[in-house]
Amino acid sequence: MDDHAENSIVVASGANMLLNEQDVDKMLEEMCEGDILLMQLEIPLQTVEYAARKAFGKGVKVVLNPAPARSLPKELFRHLYMVTPNRIEAEMLTGIKIANDADVEKVAEEICAMGVKNVIITLGSKGCLIREEGVSYRIDAFKVEPVDTTAAGDTFNGALCVGLSEGMDLKQAAVMASKASSLSLIHISEPTRPRLIS
């Protein structure tokens, strides 16, 4: 962590890289239409693609946090309900450098053109841009003095999926996720639900 509470992440995949199609099949036995599957890219891409395809076929909403940043096969996007890249990941997915607000909007449109209905591009202290069913809008970040940025994105994605699973619309869930992510910045740990509510 640097003097501005920004972190650098090093991934030692270990057991994550052993997750395979049989593991996915076991997990999907427990899921049903309307459930939410949240994934990232610290498991084999082949497993991500398989899980997305199978879950989509079952009516499960698949949310992909494309971290760590890498290019992805275009066919994956049509099996996703939503993709939630940060600025760097969004640039990697599209090849478009984000220099201003108009670029963020353009990148969100580009990602949707790949086949996914919903995109949330997280922008740190600038909040996030949501593109939902062809309409874009922004959610401001809650202003805090960061202590540790570790897991802010994970917290955002987890809270977002909790909100959606509890029946919130995407905007409501994103506001809750933004609040949770902001709270995660002011402690050296992720926020608990009671802390989020208070």
Predicted features and spans:
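Short beta-strand segments
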Residues: 1-2, 10-13, 40, 65, ...
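Conserved N-terminal subdomain of the carbohydrate kinase-like
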Residues: 1-35, 53
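Conserved functional loop/turn residues at catalytic and ligand-binding sites
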Residues: 2, 35, 42, 79, ...
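Structural motif
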Residues: 6-9, 35-36, 61-62, 81-82, ...
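Residues that scaffold the ATP/ADP-binding catalytic core of kinase and kinase-like folds
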Residues: 10, 93-95, 184
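Conserved beta-alpha-beta core of the PfkB/ribokinase-like small-molecule kinase fold
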Residues: 24, 36-106, 127-128
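Conserved phosphate-binding/catalytic region of the ribokinase-like
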Residues: 70-76, 101-189, 193
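N-terminal low-complexity segments that are often proline-rich with Ser/Thr-Pro
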Residues: 194-198
